[in-house]
Design a protein with these regions (language model features):
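N-terminal start-of-chain detector that recognizes signal peptides
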Residues: 13-15, 29, 62-64, 99-101
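Alpha-helical bundle segments that constitute or directly flank the non-heme di-iron/ferroxidase center
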Residues: 1-24, 47-58, 133
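Acidic/histidine-rich alpha-helical segments that form the ligand environment
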Residues: 7, 11, 18, 76-112
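Short, contiguous alpha-helical
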Residues: 28-72, 114-152
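Amphipathic, non-membrane alpha-helical segments in soluble helical-bundle scaffolds
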Residues: 1-9, 35-42, 86-90, 125-128
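A short secondary-structure junction motif
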Residues: 15-18, 22-25, 63, 107-110, ...
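Short leucine-rich amphipathic alpha-helices used at interfaces
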Residues: 4-5, 12-13, 89, 139-140, ...
């Protein structure tokens, strides 16, 4: 888990600065009416962080694997990230990810193998690793070719 949290902290530090350097116009521009702007992609990553944080916490103590799923388009629309200030969404994303690092670093190793239902059953260790892959995939949508990652 240390590898995951180290990598996540490095990504958050680097991309807080890189994303902050994107102009407000570019950050808010929608490629198509039905596609997310870079701002909304970062909002989606914030929603992902919120839902995964819940998985990492509830997954430790629930007797049965908790089912924690979410409808990503609804979350992005409900949060209305497109109307948020650029600095606010970046800071929210940054803080949520640092909280994930803190929770994962505090998690006893014997709980890494506990499962959570994300639509299918996965261990908390797997979810943590997948979270970073998912993050990289979407950061590539904000700053092209930042990572060599294939995420399906």
């Amino acid at each position: 888990m240390k590898k995951v949290t180290t990598e996540l902290r490095e990504i958050v530090t680097e991309f807080t600065t890189k994303i902050g350097a994107i102009s407000a116009a570019e950050f808010s521009a929608k490629p198509l009416a039905n596609k997310w702007s870079k701002k909304e992609v970062l909002g989606h990553l914030t929603d992902s962080a919120q839902n995964n944080l819940r998985r990492f916490i509830c997954g430790q103590y629930e007797v049965e694997p908790p089912k924690i799923t979410y409808q990503q388009d609804f979350w992005v629309a409900s949060n209305n990230y497109q109307a948020m200030q650029k600095e606010e969404i970046i800071e929210l994303w940054r803080l949520m990810n640092l909280r994930i690092c803190a929770v994962l670093e505090n998690m006893p190793e014997n709980l890494y193998s506990k499962e959570c239902d994300t639509g299918s059953l996965h261990t908390l260790a797997w979810i943590a690793e997948d979270y970073v892959k998912h993050l990289k995939h979407h950061l590539n949508q904000i700053i092209f070719e930042s990572f060599d990652v294939i995420y399906v």
